[in-house]
A protein has these predicted regions:
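Conserved short alpha-helical segments that host acidic/polar catalytic motifs at enzyme active sites
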Residues: 1-235
């Protein structure tokens, strides 16, 4: 169990920065072994990544004060960020976010139980880590390709887009605000973070993308026999 975070904030204010810190702080309940983030800074058109084996409250104190966050605002005046709070079940070298080919991701879930040395033969990807989230990073269509496994994912793209999605085995929520959107793993994280508005559950097996003008694109993925276990009820 981990927490994933996503944010696009147009011309963010100090109040927005405080809200973002609350999101990281409230997300740590789902993982305290490591915290990380990716963002598009004003000094570069490349994605920057910071991740450390520390809980979110220490990460916030070290990296998310207002002066640092101002520098994380992109050249267009907007903030594009994804984050991760990790509950570790293996080596801390597997911390997130991850980056490949102008895309960074944070992932909550399990993609494979196969040994890493077999991934190339099974999935066709040359992975440089033993973190199975890297398979999602390489895939262009993970909802179809790994439909049998579990995922709640937020992607940050260098062209100032955020894409997010889940299958029926992991939760994910979207909160729309006046100047942007916030993605959290659960509704209660959004509520405790005092994000304005009501968190809405992300539709299962849909790719949802926001661009730098908050234009939204939704792509439905047809997956045979898909079930949303977030709403599973015992008979």
């Amino acid at each position: 169990m981990c927490a994933v975070i996503g944010a696009i904030l147009l011309e963010p204010t100090k109040q927005d920065f405080a809200m973002l810190r609350r999101v990281f702080l409230e997300s740590k309940i789902r993982g305290m072994h490591a915290t990380g983030m990716s963002f598009l800074p004003k000094w570069s058109d490349k994605i920057e990544i910071i991740k450390e084996p520390i809980p979110a409250h220490e990460f916030i104190f070290k990296h998310l004060h207002d002066d640092n966050l101002k520098d994380m605002v992109a050249e267009d005046g907007n903030l594009y960020m994804i984050g991760h709070c990790r509950y570790s079940t293996s080596d801390l070298e597997y911390n997130q976010p991850m980056f490949y080919n102008e895309k960074s991701i944070v992932h909550n879930g399990v993609i494979t139980q196969e040994l890493p040395e077999n991934w190339k033969d099974i999935y066709g990807y040359d992975c440089i880590t033993k973190n199975d989230s890297e398979l999602v990073l390489h895939s262009n269509d993970p909802l179809r390709e790994f439909s049998h496994m579990s995922m709640g994912v937020v992607e940050l793209h260098q062209d100032r887009r955020i894409r997010f999605y889940r299958n029926g085995k992991r939760p994910l929520y979207l909160s729309s605000i006046s100047n942007g959107c916030i993605i959290t793993s659960t509704a209660d994280i959004a509520i405790r973070s005092e994000i304005p508005g009501i968190p809405v559950e992300v539709l299962m097996n849909h790719y949802i993308t926001f661009d730098n003008e908050l234009a939204m694109m939704i792509e439905k993925v047809d997956v045979e026999n898909a079930k949303d276990l977030q709403h599973y009820e015992l008979c």
